[in-house]
Structure formats: C-alpha cells, structure tokens
Amino acid sequence: MAAAFTSSPVVSQPQFTAMNEQQCFSNESIAFFYNRSGKYLATEWNTVTKLVMGLGITVCIFIMLANLLVMVAIYVNRRFHFPIYYLMANLAAADFFAGLAYFYLMFNTGPNTRRLTVSTWLLRQGLIDTSLTVSVANLLAIAIERHITVFRMQLHARMSNRRVVVVIVVIWTMAIVMGAIPSVGWNCICDIENCSNMAPLYSDSYLVFWAIFNLVTFVVMVVLYAHIFGYVRQRTMRMSRHSSGPRRNRDTMMSLLKTVVIVLGAFIICWTPGLVLLLLDVCCPQCDVLAYEKFFLLLAEFNSAMNPIIYSYRDKEMSATFRQILCCQRSENTSGPTEGSDRSASSLNHTILAGVHSNDHSVV
C-alpha cells in the first residue's frame, strides 16, 4: 500500500498555481468576471442608470440623423464630389455606425449585462471599439488630405476616386481588425489575473495598446494642423508686406485659427479623458476609475455628434444643402457641376487656401 501511495503523481503548489493561471474561463458567466474585477453589475434599474440610458439613446438618435443628413447632402450635391467630401462622407458613415453600436450598447447595459454571454459581451465592446477607431482614423485622413492640398497649393487634392476608395477600405479594415482583436484572443479569459477593471474581459495590455494608439493619432493630428497653421501664417505675414489687404490676411488667419481650435478642442475634450482613464485603470490600481467610466464614455460618443457640425455645418454650401433636403427642395447643383463650381466649394477650403492664394483671383 505504501508503494501504491508513493507511485501516485504529486502536483507541487507552484505547478498547481501555473495550471490554474492558464485555465480558460470562456464558459463562465459575465458576473464571474465583474465580481473578480470589482466592477458593479446592476441587478435592477435605478434612477442614474435610467438617466444615462435615456441620454445615451437621445445622443444615438441625433448622431444617426445628423450623419445621415451629411451623407445625403454630399450625395445629392455634385459640387461636393471631391476627395475631401468623400472622406467627410466616410466620416459621417463611421459616426452613423458609432450611433448604431452605441444604441446596441444601451440595450445591453445595466441589468441587461447579466444576460450576455462571453461572446456577446465581446461583440458589444468590439462594435464600440471599431466605431470609435474608424472615426479617429477618418479624422486623421482628413487632416492628412488638408495638409497635402495646402502645401501643394490646391483647392482639392488631385486624387482619383479609386485611391479614395482604397483609403476608405484601409480605414475600415484597420478599424475592424482593431475591434476584433480581443474577440480572437487578446483578452483575459485565459489570463484572469490581468483583467481590466473597466472592461472585465479585456486584457490590461490591450487597453494600454488601444489608448496609446489613439493618443498617438491625436498627437499626429495636432502636428499636422499646427504645421498647416504655421505655414499659412508665414505666408500671410510675408504677403501682407507687399499687398494692400492686410486686414483680409489677418481675418483669414483668425478664421483658420478658429477652425483648428474647434477641431482640436472637440477632440481633446471628448477623447482625452476616456483614454487617460484607460491608462489609469492599468497604471493606477488605487484610482477610482469606475466612478467616471459612464460619463467619459458618453463624452467620447459626443464626438461623433460634433463631427458633422465641425466639418460640415461651417460650410455655407453644405448648410444650404441641408435646408434644401429638410424642406424637400430640389437643388440646382444636383443635375451636375456648374461652371466655376470649384470657386463655390467649401468655405473651410477657402479659409485654409485664401492665405496661400491671396493674390490668385481664381480662388476668390
């Protein structure tokens, strides 16, 4: 009997711990992961949760309607059939998708979270990640397009429709891959000790990667717009010494400054707090990040509602097209481009390029 006892395998404590850490928990309930992370999982609807859900649904409806209006306006008005407007339409499509993704989230949050499986929870979060990533990537693409046109002294980028389609496909492909990464393996289901507090099924390393990726994109946008502004300011100051219209140059520079401040300010206000919160979730365990999670999530989603206003509503031609669509009026520009249509294109384009071409009457 002693021999039989000694022949049985003995698992040491370190080996047992290693085996336990490598165990996957894909069959566990969502409550299991939330309890481990310390994140509260509601059992019933309270006043705060109802208010957040009501506000979220309202924002979603506005996002979808506003961005749908932008897409229709660009489609019906042939004066908008240029690369910059195709990118703006794609941005509107991305933000429309963000509204749908967030709408899905609203009906699968709060007490409804308990009913989700691991797969559906990852799908819910993946839709949000994809929608937000594609919106940021579109903002970057627009910044790059503006940078190219200004420094080449063009009103519109000389880019073929095929290249625009390639850019759009690359943006969506990258965003879908980013959103799907946690579902295909970069999660904490088999690495339970490294689960995030804010996203209990997400790995800390993925959240750090995603936050840094978006922050780097933000920095690139700041650099691009700062370079544009510096170039235009230098040109206007140089030409004001040899022209009779310094006030016009000064007004052009200030108008550009306002546009850049609005664009960058909206991005900073809506995105930076949430991205910093993700980093604090990993780097600062004692920080109470969960207390601000829902607020910053709503704030980030507001960016999708603001993009149509920032990039489209400042355009007088776009505003007129909006009114014609809402009033069911037929636009004169839907039948085809008219002579001098380039001169009536985006006021935002004119703002950027007027300082560069202040002596070029074909742009005025």
Curated annotation (Swiss-Prot):
The record's keywords, sorted A to Z, are: Cell membrane, Disulfide bond, Endosome, G-protein coupled receptor, Glycoprotein, Membrane, Phosphoprotein, Receptor, Transducer, Transmembrane, Transmembrane helix
**What residue intervals traverse the membrane?**
51-75, 84-107, 122-144, 164-184, 205-225, 256-280, 295-315
Those parts of the protein on the Cytoplasmic side are: 76-83, 145-163, 226-255, 316-364
This protein is called what?
Lysophosphatidic acid receptor 1
Query: To which protein family does this belong?
Result: Belongs to the G-protein coupled receptor 1 family.
Query: What is the annotated quaternary arrangement, including any partners?
Result: Interacts with RALA and GRK2. Interacts with GNAQ and GNA13. Interacts with CD14; the interaction is enhanced by exposure to bacterial lipopolysaccharide (LPS).
Instruction: List the Extracellular topological domains.
Output: 1-50, 108-121, 185-204, 281-294
The scientific name of the source species is: Bos taurus (Bovine)
Give me the residues that bind a 1-acyl-sn-glycero-3-phosphate, please.
Answer: 39, 124-129, 210
Phosphothreonine-modified residues are 351
Q: Which residues carry this modification: Phosphoserine?
A: 341
Q: Give the protein's function.
A: Receptor for lysophosphatidic acid (LPA). Plays a role in the reorganization of the actin cytoskeleton, cell migration, differentiation and proliferation, and thereby contributes to the responses to tissue damage and infectious agents. Activates downstream signaling cascades via the G(i)/G(o), G(12)/G(13), and G(q) families of heteromeric G proteins. Signaling inhibits adenylyl cyclase activity and decreases cellular cAMP levels. Signaling triggers an increase of cytoplasmic Ca(2+) levels.
Which Cys-Cys disulfides exist here? Answer: 24-190, 188-195, 284-287
Which molecular function term from Gene Ontology is one that the record holds? lysophosphatidic acid receptor activity
SUPFAM superfamilies, from UniProt?
Answer: Family A G protein-coupled receptor-like
Name the major location: other
Q: Which gene carries the instructions for this protein?
A: LPAR1
Glycosylation sites (chain numbering): 27, 35
Q: Which GO terms describe its cellular component?
A: cell surface; cytoplasm; endosome; plasma membrane
Compartment(s) of residence: Cell surface; Cell membrane; Endosome
**Membrane topology according to the record:** Multi-pass membrane protein
Source organism superkingdom? Eukaryota
Sections of the chain in a coiled coil: none
State the post-translational modifications.
N-glycosylated.
Q: Which GO terms describe its biological process?
A: adenylate cyclase-activating G protein-coupled receptor signaling pathway; adenylate cyclase-inhibiting G protein-coupled receptor signaling pathway; negative regulation of cilium assembly; negative regulation of neuron projection development; neurogenesis; positive regulation of MAPK cascade; positive regulation of Rho protein signal transduction; positive regulation of stress fiber assembly
Q: Please report a single Pfam family linked to this protein.
A: 7tm_1
